[in-house]
Amino acid sequence: MLFDMVDDFLNYLRYERYRSPMTLKSYSVSLREFEDYFRSLDSELSWQTVDEDVVRDWMEHLMDGGMEASSVGTRFAALRSLYRYALARHLVERDPTYRVEPPKQRKRLPTFVKESEMNRLLDDLPWGTSFLEVRDKTIIMTFYETGIRLSELTGLDDVDIDCDNRQLKVTGKGDKQRVVPFGEELAVALGRYVACRDKEVSRKGDALFVTVKGNRMKAYDVRSRVKAKLSLVSTQKKLSPHVLRHSFATAMLNNGASIESVRRLLGHASASTTEVYTHTTFEQLRRVYKDAHPRA
């Protein structure tokens, strides 16, 4: 019986690395697909004689067939693992995946709620005067008007809010602190919320946003409340506090803010992270076109 390098590798994963049956099946399918491909190119090709060009052609073949870059990357990872295993055991003389890079995944455009939808939610829809209604509206306003993260909002204490100077201090990723400005409208809303909270709830601790029992709100509490309110005005499938962060950034850029300013407000370490929002600012391009083109 001829030695089968793929079977040998799969047995290694099964009995020495204790990989799951699902992983083994995925690896097996990916590797056999590659084997079928290179043999269809040249019946004389083998695992030992495949080169970088064959690997690249295979990935292009998969992409041309409509496969997502992430799925091609998964198959490539299986192939690279096989060759690293084979090279370490002297089953092949070279690794044809060594200088090959998997296809880059296309960045998904951030989901955001339109300015008109946010205006409708905050200005037109009726909000009650109960503690929960006042709190939830203030939370949504805070997300939309400052762009802070969910973890940053749930971590806020009263001492972090300065309504006189209209700024809040947040602790972001890596415990990095930054100061974020906000407008008069949010300052009024925060003052109204704090007054309502102190009247209606017995607070346990220093948290700004609390439950009806006075405890600091958990992330899932905030997430569910935000989703429920956003669903009243938006048909987006994904509705969350992070979508409000995207909405903040998009609104800022659409209305003339620079990438660097938005980067600092969001607490991004690199402008490359913020640049993804430039793909969503079509309204700004539309306005420029309408103002500048003689036939617009």
What is each of the regions a protein language model found here?
Residues 1-296:
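Conserved catalytic core of the tyrosine transesterase superfamily
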